[in-house]
Amino acid sequence: MTPKDKQLANSIYLILAALFIASLVTSNLIFQKFFYWEPFGWYRFEISVGILPYPITFLITDILSEIYGKKKANQVVIAGIFASFFSILIILAADFTTAINNSPVNNETFHQVFGLSPFAVFASMIAYLFAQFIDIRIFHFWKQLTKGKHLWLR
């Protein structure tokens, strides 16, 4: 691989990592809004909008696994978890501060939107971490089983 190709590969990796982290953190910020989904009019599901970015994260880890390998994909997952916890700490710190009288967002509104249940978020992040690691492991299991062929199967 030429130095130019290496630089391009690194740039693509960083872009994919940034998209992964942005999707993960965004899902944690928007999870409190819900909508109804009625596939084919058969059943009505009440779903958090926080689920919308999730498929993007799994697609990105599959792309990273295919191109950069299991180790690099796992590194992005761990970086995403750290970014999520860090953003939660910032939000909690912001929630503990007192808004000034003429603030466009008062304390109650801010807390209602961003006042996270730390235990629920922690449990969600741990479940997500395991789901991502399992996804990456299964992806590589199928890749090894098919000897790198049948990408559609993975």
Task: Give, region by region, the residue ranges found by the protein language model.
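Internal alpha-helical transmembrane segments of multi-pass membrane proteins
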Residues: 146-154
